[in-house]
Amino acid sequence: MSYKKYKKFLERLQYQSSPTHSCILYQREGISADEFIEATYSNKCFQVLHNVCGESVKEDYGDWDLEHFMTLDEENTKLLMLRTGSHDGAGLIKEIEKRFASAGYLAKKKIEEFCMAKGITYSEHCY
């Protein structure tokens, strides 16, 4: 997704009445389409998904596709919004993108480090 298309996507999110806001944080040349990070703010919870798929994943784990989720509940999402200066879900996603997208496929790890440093609790699971 080009920066221009991505910016339009974020602008549409600001005016969306749906409680679900999502965006691709990082996907460009140099990082394969098999590795991407998506942030979702939905139902007052914040979630970061790091998806990895491909032959090496199948060899190591017996599955082509692994999804690693980091999830913050409502209270910790509010704390994350406070720590990032965001006022709503769309603002939170924009702030997360601004701060962490440049880390590429390491963005999930960087967000986790930020949360730990700020005392924000999250849960993790993998499918």
Per-range role (PLM):
Residues 73-127:
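Low-complexity intrinsically disordered segments
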Residues 17-47:
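Amphipathic, interaction-prone secondary-structure segments
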Residues 11-12, 35, 57-59:
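Intrinsically disordered, low-complexity boundary segments flanking structured domains
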Residues 2-26:
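Anionic N-terminal interaction surfaces
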Residues 46-91:
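Acidic, aromatic-enriched beta-alpha/helix-loop junctions
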Residues 2-5, 25, 40, 45, ...:
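Intrinsically disordered, low-complexity N-terminal regions enriched in serine/proline/glycine
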